[in-house]
Amino acid sequence: MEWYWIGLLIVVVLFLLSAVRIVKEYERGVIFRLGRLVGARGPGLFFIIPILENMVVVDLRTVTYDVPSQEVVTKDNVTVKVNAVVYYRVVDPAKAVTEVFDYQYATAQLAQTTLRSIIGQAELDEVLSERDKLNVKLQQIIDEETNPWGIKVTAVEIKDVELPEEMRRIMAMQAEAERERRSKIIRAEGEYQAAMKLREAADVLAQSEGAILLRYLQTLNEISAEQNTTIVMPIPVELLKFFVEKAKS
């Protein structure tokens, strides 16, 4: 008889232990009773009726999913390899359990197919230069598709765009040609500005003989300041005329 009570006590203890569930702060427990959805509970300590009830625990923290590299043909027929990262979390645990068999796998597959679709509709220049725009588009589409599953997609970011080797060489040549073009434009603008300054100076000097002579004498003074230098400079006729006119006056 004593063994009977001991066995009964053990059964009761095991029954109580199997009925206790602890749900963490970042989790929710989706409870089913006789196969019917009761609702999501948590966080805290809960008791369920063994055999009649069961609970599925769902993590509410943000999940980071790395989309594997996808080989895609862009709208302008360029083959590229693209990968991305998707950030999502469960906002409705009951839907995440009842509306889809495996919400994590389903979200991952949807992210891959959507990435291929969006990149395939864009041209290469758009993929390379308008990545933020494509990120927003991807986020909106995936979020809309996963909403019935109780999933919220917070962000999608395209990480790497790998181009074929031949395309990389062509783009490098184009970049070099663009740099050379800009360099030529800058040099041409500099030469144009210098020519304009010289023209302005020539106009000023042409309006005054004294200015021409003054500039000539200034040049002679600068040259004569150099040591160990013998310079033979012709005397301009204008300079002789200037001194003759000064002497007569």
From Swiss-Prot:
Residues making up the signal peptide according to the UniProt record: none
SMART domains linked: PHB (SM00244)
Membrane-spanning parts: 3-23
A GO cellular-component term linked to this record: plasma membrane
Keywords assigned by UniProt, alphabetized: Membrane, Transmembrane, Transmembrane helix
Membrane topology: Single-pass membrane protein
Pfam families: Band_7
Domain of life: Archaea
Subcellular location: Membrane
Main localisation: membrane
Entry's family note: Belongs to the band 7/mec-2 family.
Protein name in UniProt: Uncharacterized protein AF_1420
Protein source organism: Archaeoglobus fulgidus (strain ATCC 49558 / DSM 4304 / JCM 9628 / NBRC 100126 / VC-16)
